[in-house]
Amino acid sequence: MSETVAGEWGRPVNTAAHQKGGIHDDETAADLGFEGGTVAGSIHMEQFLPLLLDVFGDAWWSTGVLSMYFRQATVDRQPVRCFLTPGNNGQARVWMENEEQQMIMEGTANLGECDLPTALGARLDALRPAGELRILKNMAVDQQTQAETRVGSEFMDNQLQVITESHENFTSNAAYGQRVLSNTQVVRIFDPAEQRLAEAAIGPFVGLYGGIEVAFENGPVLEETAYESTCKVVGLGDSPKTEILWRESQLLKDGQPVARMLKMDRLMKNSSPLWD
């Protein structure tokens, strides 16, 4: 077994705390049983970048795959730390802990195609048939849509003011002609198609990320660049407390794949009047 490496402690900012009525809002989150407004898992994923570049090198920008399953929520500026154990098969094990050594998230990292399943892909493969769905009853596997999308420099500038782990490629266009989007911004660029597909869900409800896999196919993803995003429902499930929506999205530039994302969303049953 290769030696585990650890990153520096970080204090991620809850950048969506102002979004009232959502899981990142202190009052709403507390009503649903959380300690406070939660930090998005996509923000936590950014903290792994130094470890990923140390192990995989600059190839990470073009073909890196980070697949994370979220186990426990954190609140604004709660200290967390990343860990990585390289594997002999080209796939690394990655995870994050808080100061009490509780696991916040765990997953896998690799370059390009890998013979082993990713952390989130394995969970999708093992998905059991859904029981009763009320919020998602109008959604079905293989529903899909598409949308044009881009991330502008203003949004990127705002995110960089509070990013946990920055990089020169996020602040300078020297390497790729435009600045590179961080993980949070890559997740954001898939929003237009994702939201269009989610219109079939029956609100109101509060959702939170259960897991995210971001895979660069011909990366990186750049600011102020026009892309097309496709999104498809690839799984529906449930647990005692949530309904679960799985979506897979792909980002295209002039018809060529740039990146894809697999996302698991948990919709809280106790946030929906359909489950009263």
Each predicted region: which residue ranges?
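An N-terminal domain-cap segment
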Residues: 58-74
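HotDog/MaoC-like acyl-thioester-processing domains
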Residues: 1-13, 75-140, 218-276
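Short structured motifs
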Residues: 65-70, 211-218
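Hot-dog-fold acyl-thioester-processing enzymes
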Residues: 1-63, 116-211, 272-276
